[in-house]
């Protein structure tokens, strides 16, 4: 799950950096809060793997809110909260600033070194087909649909009020 989330976030948050004016929808990403539905699939050695996931995302700068696989993940750019309501579990982690796969902001700031690892196709005015090459054998494909650009609203939607959770929740804080 961590690889799905961080791969998706790295891809999404870096889209504006890769636009270079060639795909108009990408030029708008840095100046807006972006909301969309995604489908994620993984392939290895050119063959699709059975794992296909979908969910909804809201992104603003280096903060995001993602729901999928029965989980809700929020990050304000420094802390990540991963909640499974059904299991009544919450995992709190620090966003690692040194690791590309756990810090999408690093991906943005270092995008020039990774331009050969992302392929973007604009399917329509409000959808994208993005492939992120993870290594020589493995790639992740994200199809982003129903992309909506909203005004920026700040990071309060990307944090979690842990004290509001029921006492039955198991909270693991790894910060």
Language model regions located:
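Non-transmembrane domains of secretory- and envelope-associated proteins
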Residues: 124-175
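A generic structural motif
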Residues: 39-45, 67, 83-85, 133-135
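Positively charged n-region of N-terminal signal peptides that target proteins for export
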Residues: 1-4
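Extended beta-strand-rich segments in extracellular/periplasmic secretory proteins, especially
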Residues: 61-63, 105-139
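An acidic-aromatic
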Residues: 56-102
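Bacterial N-terminal signal peptides
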Residues: 7-16
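Short, surface-exposed charged micro-motifs
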Residues: 54-56, 70-72, 119, 139-141
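N-terminal leader/targeting segments and the immediate start of mature chains
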Residues: 15-50, 62, 163-175
């Amino acid at each position: 799950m961590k690889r799905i989330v961080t791969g998706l976030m790295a891809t999404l948050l870096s889209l504006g950096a890769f636009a270079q004016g060639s795909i108009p929808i990408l030029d708008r990403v840095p100046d807006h809060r972006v909301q969309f539905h995604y489908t994620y699939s993984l392939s290895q050695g050119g063959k699709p793997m059975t794992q296909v996931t979908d969910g909804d995302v809201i992104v603003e700068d280096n903060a995001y809110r993602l729901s999928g696989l029965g989980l809700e993940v929020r990050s304000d750019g420094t802390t990540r909260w991963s909640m499974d309501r059904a299991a009544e579990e919450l995992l709190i982690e620090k966003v690692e600033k040194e690791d590309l796969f756990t810090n999408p902001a690093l991906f943005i700031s270092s995008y020039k070194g990774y331009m050969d690892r992302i392929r973007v196709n604009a399917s329509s005015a409000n959808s994208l087909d993005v492939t992120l090459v993870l290594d020589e054998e493995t790639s992740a494909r994200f199809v982003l649909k129903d992309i909506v650009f909203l005004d920026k609203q700040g990071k309060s939607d990307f944090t979690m009020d842990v004290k509001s959770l029921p006492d039955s929740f198991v909270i693991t804080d790894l910060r």
